[in-house]
Amino acid sequence: MEHTYQYLWIISFVTLPVPMLIGMGLLLFPVSTKKLHRIWAFPSVLLLSIVMVFSTDLFIQQINSSSIYQYVWSWTINNDFSLEFGHLIDPLTSILLILITTVGILVLVYSDSYMSHDQGYLRFFVYMSFFNTSMLGLVTSSNLIQIYIFWELVGMCSYLLIGFWFTRPIVSNACQKAFVTNRVGDFGLLLGILGLYWITGSFEFQDLFEIFNNLIYNNDNEVHFLFVTLCAFLLFSGAIAKSAQFPLHVWLPDAMEGPTPISALIHAATMVAAGIFLVARLLPLFVVIPYIMKLIALIGIITVLLGATLAFAQKDIKRGLAYSTMSQLGYTMLALGMGSYRAALFHLITHAYSKALLFLGSGSIIHSMEGIVGYSPDKSQNMVLMGGLTKHVPITKIAFLLGTLSLCGIPPLACFWSKDEILNDSWSYSPIFAIIAFSTAGLTAFYMFRVYLLTFEGHLNIYFQNYSGKKNSAFYSISLWGKQGSKILKKKMRLLPLLTINNKNNNERASFFCFFWKKIYQTGGTVRKMTCPFITINHFGTKRIFSYPQESDNTILFPMLVLVLFTLFIGAIGIPFNQFNKEEMNLDILSKLLIPSLSLLHQNQNESVDWYEFVTNSTFSVSIASFGIFIASSLYKPIYSSLQNLKFLNLVAKKGPKRILWDKIINVIYDWSYNRGYIDVFYTISLTEGIRRLAELTSFFDRRVIDGITNGVGFTSFFAGEGIKYVGGGRISFYLLLYLFYVLIFLLISSSIFSSFSSL
């Protein structure tokens, strides 16, 4: 086992050969590499699967041994300073390794089909593999310098993936916004790291915690206390930006302009979890500063409520899920601020799998809509144009419904167990925070079921909208950089998630991973036999276009079905009561795993809850969630529209001033949500316009004042020279006499000054 831990640093770089080999292939054999580009999905998945196997073994060893391992290599620069690099293996690391690898593998398999139509397929897998390498390096880092290096690499990969289709102006603006917003937090993180090193003289976590605690408990110097509090806040600012917490949350909804698999991996399960990971890693440092813990809880509860309210009126399905991510990560941050370390990590796990399922489900929905509206994110992601998809994409519908119920906190799905634990802990921390947290649980159920009902219930609304898309627009090609082309396909084709064209070989599979699932499905007379289980893929002619959405292929559906299993059963690892537990059986796996971390935080390791007490406490939260679902069903289910047409109900609804007041309240809430709480507008006016006006003022000062002085001296010399040249008469003797006269005056002045100094 010692050798396993000693060489575990290798797992951070196992996935690195994929981008290197793709780069070498494009350099040495560009034609063959591009022609065989689909095979690169296999090594990407294979290498990450190897990492997952080792991570699972590590997870089991951590449960059995309950210990922390750290290996460090020192690079001595001089006698006073040395850099140390290594890896730290503890429960937090093992949890994040499992999370990154499992979700990463499923997203890579999903992406093989989802991105099959895109000419940037190779570039996509290069970015994804490098991102996985960066995240694995981040969670295994043993000191703050290593964390910062991989932190920046993760940010770079996020920038590249958000801007994957950068020829679209809205995409380039989105990746720039994400980059600049994260730079604010990253700059604070760097200052905090340098400040802590100046105080403690170390970057290593163990040394840092010990020295920091001694400094807080043994030193009454207020200057030091204020400085360490400032450093802790600067460290926390990095987590605020990375995890999209208020007030640096504005980049996350715009980041949805990237491909949907990116949203599932980076902006739901892993990268936004990096901020939570940083706070959890540094919690022994934060916990000795009460002001910072209160600030973490305050930021968390504000983000919980803000994210929920901003999700109310979103029309874009991915942006609605983005605000949901923001709100749920706020719950996790709230738990960390309250000191509920176990509940925070539990919710991080359950939310990651549930939200990854929802994002992959939204990608399946978007692909099915692209068969009708073409490559147009404004249309294919617009829930206003959806509806009635239940009978067209039944498997996606079931998966999406389970993810929605989990996020709403409905038992026995994953998020119920973790969210309920956070809600119960909030009562003992602050009644005000508890009221907000419980209320937001109802709001979460409302806006998530709003998304579900608008998407799957009723009728396909695109046929009832003023939609002016061209008939052939569904068959646009996608350029290398994601730009919509004008090329119309003129050959017979198979409609895959978007397009996969090959007429010569009818046995060509939908994606690389279809090779592993062979089954023939016989369909109608005009349709040929195809290889793929969950759906029937047709060959269509030139002008043929889908009238209704079609279910996605097996490569897209398989990862979703695996995530359904996680959503159903992952909550079992943290069931908080052990009433039926015998001496040889321990149901609460998570608490057993976190024993070393809880010991470091001096928290109680045996927090088993009586099952009757748990059911009593959870009944209230489930009732609130059920009420939110009921309100959403009342407002958005098709039966409501039918009832509204009844004359009697219309008379009652429109009767009296209460209806007018209600409409005004609804409009205010809608405007608040649709305009993102006016926070983006505030930043645009106060920061963007302020910086622009400051730049204009600086430019005016530079051109008018600085350049004016310089140009003024030049103009003065020019005109003085022009005036003087007319004084002389053109005789050289006169010029010599005038020159000698000026020299004589200069000597007299110099001698008088020298004599006055010598007399002193």
Curated annotation (Swiss-Prot):
It is a multi-pass membrane protein. GO terms for cellular component: chloroplast thylakoid membrane. One of its GO terms (biological process) is ATP synthesis coupled electron transport. Pfam families: Proton_antipo_C, Proton_antipo_M, Proton_antipo_N. It is found in: Plastid, Chloroplast thylakoid membrane. InterPro entries: NADH_UbQ_OxRdtase_chlpt_su5_C, NADHpl_OxRdtase_5_subgr, ND/Mrp_TM, NU5C-like, Proton_antipo_N. Its EC number is 7.1.1.-. Disulfide bonds: none annotated. One of its GO terms (molecular function) is quinone binding. The chain crosses the membrane at residues 9-29, 39-59, 89-109, 125-145, 147-167, 185-205, 221-241, 260-280, 282-302, 329-349, 356-376, 398-418, 429-449, 556-576, 620-640, 734-754. Keywords: Chloroplast, Membrane, NAD, NADP, Plastid, Plastoquinone, Quinone, Thylakoid, Translocase, Transmembrane, Transmembrane helix, Transport. It is an enzyme of class 7 (translocase). It catalyses: a plastoquinone + NADH + (n+1) H(+)(in) = a plastoquinol + NAD(+) + n H(+)(out); a plastoquinone + NADPH + (n+1) H(+)(in) = a plastoquinol + NADP(+) + n H(+)(out). NDH is composed of at least 16 different subunits, 5 of which are encoded in the nucleus. NCBIfam families: NDH_I_L, PRK06590.1. Belongs to the complex I subunit 5 family. NDH shuttles electrons from NAD(P)H:plastoquinone, via FMN and iron-sulfur (Fe-S) centers, to quinones in the photosynthetic chain and possibly in a chloroplast respiratory chain. The immediate electron acceptor for the enzyme in this species is believed to be plastoquinone. Couples the redox reaction to proton translocation, and thus conserves the redox energy in a proton gradient. This is NAD(P)H-quinone oxidoreductase subunit 5, chloroplastic. It comes from Populus alba.
